[in-house]
């Protein structure tokens, strides 16, 4: 469950009391992992997979009550603000309009000159923080237009122009640094609390970066861009398949892996190091893109005319191991996989993913059926891109697939189809099993987080107050203990 989906008073889940209470709930339920979506600052469309920075955190998650405890805000500054009337859905427009004003007030009450920890944070994170903070100050100054539409000198980062805006926007730049300081401070305290309860945080890293991001603006050489306009030459996507005749056109700029290799993959090493400050375990999205990626000419309307290009494969991960050491990674290996992709994943040793909803098409050799699992995998009841179990049974699953699922897991209405599927995942040989919180709560597709290739209402679901009960925790604990997953 993502941070944004936590219950609470101020429109969106935060690093506040509800997050700590959720850690308590997970401990009572005998759970060892809390998997979340990317924590990056969201942009248009509110997707955590399209953020303004691969390094910065989302200011929306900063808890206002904690700022009050630090004497940076009075309760009157935020308690009566309109963050949205529906506690089960995030209104991102209101959060953007109201919460950012409140956070600005907190900054105005913050004495950065006398705060040694703030100065240390700025120095420690200087490599990305300076560019990001200037980027965000410029985004606000230029009414959020894409940096590709800024005037040429600042778009191309001419030194005189950079220095001019650093001076002109000095206070705004410092404000964005303050927000990152608060984000990382509050998150560290929450993560430490979870870790003391023997709960590891599984974080999510998108393989690609948004074109309209501080990373592309400040590091154009690591992407395949037109040297004059800095627009992409190639963009990301995936090829046509049984689900889409034209494929999926994601539109992110493609890495210049040749250039990155010459730098010993410095940017990627920095990114992994930074991510390990946030998470204990990293799930890397679209992992197959490191073996080979689908490259589409910029300007194409669909992905169907793209082609496969070889990726860095083990060269990248050998450098990461050399520079950082052994780290825990989950390879998101869903979708179109070739023998080369499977062999590459095997060489990394990283566990892949098994999604139970994919199990009931085809015959008994379907790799997503639990009897075909290998131990070195992570089994899921679903992900942010799937229906809930209840939604699958009620709406989207085919009659044949649902009949197979009922027979395979011996599902009954008395037990509850959701609990029967969870039981099936928990009882598998997978080293790790993870359930979507909506499935434990037996919610339908109204609680689905994301429907790919659509825009409306994605990333908006929030849990109701008081749903993480002792009764539910005990039920999850009993199931977890039966299958030896508490040890």
From Swiss-Prot:
A single GO cellular-component term from the record reads: cytoplasm
| SUPFAM superfamilies for this protein | (Trans)glycosidases
Query: What EC designation does it have?
Result: 2.4.1.25
Xref: Gene3D superfamilies: Glycosidases
In terms of InterPro entries, this protein maps to: Glyco_hydro_77, Glycoside_hydrolase_SF
Task: Identify the Pfam families for this entry.
Answer: Glyco_hydro_77
Could you give a GO molecular-function term held by this entry? 4-alpha-glucanotransferase activity
Q: Which domain of life is it from?
A: Bacteria
Report the top EC class in one word: transferase
Would you kindly state one Gene Ontology biological process term found in this protein's UniProt entry? carbohydrate metabolic process
Q: Where in the cell is it found?
A: Cytoplasm
Keyword line:
Carbohydrate metabolism, Cytoplasm, Glycosyltransferase, Transferase
Reactions that this protein is recorded to catalyse: Transfers a segment of a (1->4)-alpha-D-glucan to a new position in an acceptor, which may be glucose or a (1->4)-alpha-D-glucan
As for what it does, the entry says: Catalyzes a disproportionation reaction in which single or multiple glucose units from oligosaccharides are transferred to the 4-hydroxyl group of acceptor sugars. Glucose, maltose and maltotriose can act as acceptor, whereas of the three only maltotriose can act as donor.
Q: Which family does it belong to?
A: Belongs to the disproportionating enzyme family.
Name the UniProt record assigns to this protein: 4-alpha-glucanotransferase
The coding gene here is: malQ
